[in-house]
UniProtKB/Swiss-Prot annotation:
Source species of the chain: Homo sapiens (Human)
Record-given protein name: eIF5-mimic protein 1
Stretches assigned to the W2 domain: 248-415
Location in or out of the cell: Cytoplasm
Phosphoserine modified-residue sites: S412, S414
Gene3D superfamilies (alphabetical): 1.25.40.180
Any one biological process term the GO annotation gives: regulation of translational initiation
Gene field: BZW2
């Protein structure tokens, strides 16, 4: 069967699609066009932003995103490792970039705005920019100290305004950066810039969302991964808020472990003397205050039993159970603040577990008689230290007992005066 040649349409010109037009550009052509435009715009960052906005319609930002961001940050295309590919040819580089900018927060913030505008205009660059920043952090050893500082400031500002996620910081945990002290030094500069944009709560919240709150010690070599070393390093750098945050995080981790072990010992019905000894040792070893422990003890004690579902029976069951563990609670409620925390925990528990609503007053009286709670703590709770949960119900329950305490106090005072 003969194959016939397909007819060719003559006299017709086809317009190249814009997408295909873009793909004709090679990285070097892309680089030259970008460098020329940045040099023409000069130090006028508004002009730079406009140039980048308009040029995106004819340059393929999607394909050459790494080249685009290399040049905007370092002024040149970067080879693997961070060295400049065109270091010897000034015509292929620009001085109008982050690394050539003045080393002050306001100047770098203005550069950050250029990145913000570019990524808002071309949303598809968002992921590419995140990848670029992770890459640049891996290349820190190739950059000078002042370049590292400017990159840290830029990263902190962009983290502050939400352009970058905190996950970029994982690059800092690279062994070589950690061992040479670059990771910790860079992190301090970055956090300072971040906290100049946002408050400490916002910064720590972002760290938690990125699951980095428990990894901050990894900024230091293994032999220096202690809370004390971190706290001193960051406090000396003016970042006490981060030091305090890490201490709290470490304390929370310790408390979880302590709670788990306590729960196990209570379920095995270990003698109270043994539990007291264990808790005291853990408090000393982990520098835990009594105020941090009393709430844990209450939670563990209440979790150690299967409660009756009938409201009329649960109060009796609770009193019997708590009477057994009152000596344990008494040991760790020797301070007024600890007593108030315990009272608030009892209040919250009785509110959250509806069968216990009517048992609150009976529990407090039991603790008073067992020397777990003092008269002063109960009166302070009643007057000002109660929490909002079910307060009207519980204050009403406690009214007669509080009146009795106040009368007893007045009688005691009058007897003292007579004597």
């Amino acid at each position: 069967m003969n194959k016939h040649q397909k007819p060719v349409l003559t006299g017709q010109r086809f317009k190249t699609r814009k997408r295909d037009e873009k793909e004709k550009f090679e990285p070097t052509v892309f680089r030259d066009t970008l460098v020329q435009g940045l040099n023409e715009a000069g130090d006028d960052l508004e002009a730079v932003a406009k140039f980048l906005d308009s040029t995106g319609s004819r340059l393929d930002y999607r394909r050459y995103a790494d080249t685009l961001f290399d040049i905007l940050v370092a002024g040149s295309m970067l080879a693997p490792g961070g060295t400049r590919i065109d270091d010897g040819d000034k015509t292929k580089m620009t001085n109008h970039c982050v690394f050539s900018a003045n080393e002050d927060h306001e100047t770098i913030r203005n550069y950050a705005q250029v990145f913000n505008k570019l990524i808002r205009r071309y949303k598809y660059l968002e992921k590419a920019f995140e990848d670029e920043m992770k890459k640049l952090l891996l290349f820190l050893k190739a950059f000078s100290e002042t370049e590292q500082t400017k990159l840290a400031m830029l990263s902190g500002i962009l983290l502050g305004n939400g352009t970058l996620p905190a996950t970029i910081l994982t690059s800092l945990f690279t062994d070589s950066l950690v061992k040479e002290g670059i990771a910790a030094s860079f992190a301090v500069k970055l956090f300072k810039a971040w906290m100049a944009e946002k408050d400490a709560n916002s910064v720590t919240s972002s760290l938690r969302k990125a699951n980095l709150d428990k990894r901050l010690l990894e900024l230091f070599p293994v032999n220096r991964q202690s809370v004390d070393h971190f706290a001193k390093y960051f406090t000396d750098a003016g970042l006490k808020e981060l030091s305090d945050f890490l201490r709290v995080q470490q304390s929370l981790g310790t408390r979880k472990e302590l709670q788990k072990e306590l729960q196990e010992r209570l379920s095995q019905e270990c003698p109270i003397k043994e539990v007291v000894l264990y808790v005291k040792e853990e408090m000393k070893r982990n520098d835990l205050p009594e105020t941090a422990v009393i709430g844990l003890l209450w939670t563990c004690i209440m979790n150690a039993v299967e409660w009756n579902k009938k409201e009329e029976l649960v109060a009796e069951q609770a009193l019997k159970h708590l009477k057994q563990y009152a000596p344990l609670l008494a040991v760790f409620s020797s301070q007024g603040q600890s007593e108030l925390i315990l009272l608030q925990k009892v209040q919250e528990y009785c509110y959250d577990n509806i069968h216990f609503m009517k048992a609150f007053q009976k529990i407090v009286v039991l603790f008073y008689k067992a020397d777990v709670l003092s008269e002063e703590a109960i009166l302070k709770w009643y007057k000002e230290a109660h929490v909002a949960k079910g307060k009207s119900v519980f204050l009403d329950q406690m009214k007669k007992f509080v009146e009795w305490l106040q009368n007893a106090e007045e009688e005691s005072e009058s007897e003292g005066e007579e004597n």
